[in-house]
Amino acid sequence: MPRRRVIGQRKILPDPKFGSELLAKFVNILMVDGKKSTAESIVYSALETLAQRSGKSELEALEVALENVRPTVEVKSRRVGGSTYQVPVEVRPVRRNALAMRWIVEAARKRGDKSMALRLANELSDAAENKGTAVKKREDVHRMAEANKAFAHYRW
């Protein structure tokens, strides 16, 4: 670990269409091989489809979907005296968003729809309705934390 100073987190530029930092982060997570314009067109197309389905604005629809996928607790491995325990810890707000977006993108990539924009739109609408693979992932993480509640005193 460096001993000098802690490097601050980089500021992310808000996306050009909606001016949202959250959406810019979502585009960056979806981006593959530095193709940002492709990622932007996929996200904007998916949000447009989602907004038409839900009757809300694009950003509101995205926020609802993310809210249903954000984890509140997760487990971290902690080695104590030769055995490893899965210790439940609370998730920081920045990490909550990052995990939710990552899980939605992963779930969308695994879907079998035609285009990525359609897959993403379907996964986001499923997440908004509290169903789908990304929501299931959050439930699994919460269940794991609940099962290991007995080891919570090992928190650091």
UniProtKB/Swiss-Prot annotation:
GO terms for cellular component: small ribosomal subunit. GO terms for molecular function: rRNA binding; structural constituent of ribosome; tRNA binding. The keyword Repeat does not apply. The keyword Methyltransferase does not apply. Coiled coil: none annotated. Belongs to the universal ribosomal protein uS7 family. Part of the 30S ribosomal subunit. Contacts proteins S9 and S11. NCBIfam families: rpsG_bact (TIGR01029). One of the primary rRNA binding proteins, it binds directly to 16S rRNA where it nucleates assembly of the head domain of the 30S subunit. Is located at the subunit interface close to the decoding center, probably blocks exit of the E-site tRNA. This is Small ribosomal subunit protein uS7. The gene is rpsG.
